[in-house]
Structures are given as C-alpha cells and as structure tokens.
Amino acid sequence: MMAERFSALQAVAGPVSRETFDGLVAFEGEFRKWSARINLTAPSTLPHLWERHILDSAQLIRIAPAARRWLDLGSGGGFPGAVIAILMKEHAPAQVDLVESNRKKAAFLQTSLASLKAPCMIHPQRIEDCYGQIPPPEVITARALAPLPVLFGLAEPWMKAGARALLHKGRDYRREIEESRDAWGFNLLEHGNEVGGDGVILEISDLRRL
C-alpha cells in the first residue's frame, strides 16, 4: 500500500525523498484527526484524501520545478499550499506563504506544518489584508477559492510584480476564461490534470487590467 502511494506521488511530482513522502503521510494523518473536530473538507472526499487532494496538489511541482517562493491564497485545509510546503523541505532555501482567514483552519495549518518543520508561514487574515506584508512570490496558487475574475483581482498586486499563477479549475473553466477577458489581459497555458477528472490547471502570467 505505502509503496504504491510512494510511486503514485513520484509519478505526479517527480523525484521525491522517502522523508518527504513520510511527511505527507503524517500530514494526512493530522488532517484526518482534525477533520473529526472541524470542517476541513467535504466529508465525501475523505476516503480518497491521498488521490483527491494530496496528489492533486503535488502535481504543481512538475509545472514549476524551479520555483522556491510560493503563495497559496485561501488555503483552507492546506491544498495545495501545505502539500507544496512539505515538498519544499528538500529544496531549501524555500518559503511558502499560506493565507487562510478561518481561524480554526489556520490553527490546523500552523500546528501540523510546524510539527513537520515545513518552510512556511501561515497568515490568518483576509487576502486583501496581506498586501504589502508578503513579498512577491514566484508562483501563486489557489484551489476551489473563487471564479477567475475574482481571483485575478485578489492576486493582482503580486502578479504585477512578476508572479505567475497556477490555478486548479473544474469543467467550467472555459466559461470563466471568457468572462475574464472583458476586464483582464493575460497569457494562458492549460495543463491537463495528471490525477484525472475533468479539471485543468491554468498557468496565468503577465496579468494586466484592460
């Protein structure tokens, strides 16, 4: 079972040490424990937590293998930000900033990631309150947070400084792209989801208001 999980992780994220794999397994265990007390994710997805959330998050590393400064907006239960932070342990020096305004979820992230000594900082604030506090990252991530036009408005201050965004989107992503084009210009690359399903990962760069 563990060997299969390790192989699946390497298939989507590239070479990963056994220590990093063990860290992700430990995070999964903490996630399940805390989920019994607070709502970290939809209960229906818990039986498939490794594939549905952890591997789905880990695949971003393959798209931006050289990035060392990441910013995760609306981190929720830690996907993809916590997974990226754990993966970054073997790529020091690295920094992952996770922004989550829900205090209980932020407490979970702080406790679980501190115990794993992940190179990250948790910001228990609204995204808009973090402008000027978090230095420009190389990559911005967001998963199940908001439609593209809203995401662009939230990410704009960092993207103007040169960051690119890797955004998980579902089957309606083309409609969101078209709705964004009235107000925003941007470069777009579409990456297939290596874990399966109808979703994609949108790589956005050179974001600008029209």
Curated annotation (Swiss-Prot):
Signal peptide (UniProt feature, chain positions): none
Gene Ontology molecular function: rRNA (guanine-N7-)-methyltransferase activity
GO CC list: cytosol
Keywords from the named record: Cytoplasm, Methyltransferase, rRNA processing, S-adenosyl-L-methionine, Transferase
Enzyme class: transferase
Classification via InterPro entries: rRNA_ssu_MeTfrase_G, SAM-dependent_MTases_sf
Residues that, per the record, bind S-adenosyl-L-methionine: 74, 79, 127-128, 143
Reactions catalysed: guanosine(527) in 16S rRNA + S-adenosyl-L-methionine = N(7)-methylguanosine(527) in 16S rRNA + S-adenosyl-L-homocysteine
Function of the molecule: Specifically methylates the N7 position of guanine in position 527 of 16S rRNA.
The protein's name in its UniProt record: Ribosomal RNA small subunit methyltransferase G
Protein species of origin: Chelativorans sp. (strain BNC1)
